[in-house]
Amino acid sequence: MAVPRRKASGAGEINYPASEETESQRMTPKKGVDGGKIILYLIIALVAALFLMNFLLPSIGVGGCIGVIALDGEIATSDGYGTVGSENFVELLQRADSRPDVKGIIIEINSPGGSVVASREIYSALLKINKTKIAYISEMGASGGYYVAVGTDYIFADPASITGSIGAVATLLDISQLMNKTGISETTIKSGAMKDIGTMYRPANENETMLLNAIVNEIFTDFKDTVVLERSGNERFSNTKFQEVLDARILSGKQAYNIGLVDQLGTRQEARAYLGEAVGLGKNPQICRIQAERGFLSSLMESIGHGIGDTLTKGIDVQNLRLFS
């Protein structure tokens, strides 16, 4: 096929014949471009709106909610598998207290207790919270779990929940007889007679038992006095009835209510409705869950790390001596 010859329109100038397709593309808008831009703009606007709702509105107190913080598991000084770390829990309390959109705080408790120090740390932190705060005991809020509850302004409990157990305990493990049977021996070099108190490799002697008993009673007295301080204002509280349960017995929620250790019996929803009305949000308040923001891997590694740390601590320092409230 012959190739069209290019025409010269002047000296040194060559004109190319314009193709119909090129002219058509110039005259007709490209389909899909404007629509794509609109979708992109909508996505950007949506992201900005979500950012505004999640970050800016709470910071200026628009709307309102009650902050729900779960205390679920054994109370310890640091987080681990099945435990609640007091340090992180206190941070959650402070975060809720500093948010203008959180009008009140409810601690939802399901804990058998735990570390004396950790329980008291959370109790002390609750006393510094400025907002209205209540506790709800669901399945269990015993011992250290109840210690935490008395730091709030009002205690709800399910009638069938387990609470009470006001006391302290030190646990010692003795495997010396097993070692004798298996022919295993252990030698301890120590600077003082009681440096290895709590060791599992021999029975505790009389002086060690007396010392530990004094510490346990000191912790118990502090626990008891704290309960009297925080609960004596309840109209049902009776010191005579209270003395009867100081053998560290567990109580049902209903039994605790009858002697003034709990303010009201009810469900989780009723506790939230009570707090909602108390802070002016009505019986169906919006819920803001205050919780640690961690991924699965970080939580797993933290649990493993604390487990190793606890094992080393027990083996090198306090061995198997554990004080629980």
Describe the role of every protein-language-model region.
Residues 1-135, 140-141, 154-157, 172-325:
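N-terminal organellar transit peptides
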Residues 145:
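Pocket-flanking alpha-helical
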Residues 148-149, 256:
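Hydrophobic/aromatic residues within transmembrane alpha-helices
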Residues 152-170:
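Zinc-dependent metallopeptidase catalytic helix centered on the HExxH motif
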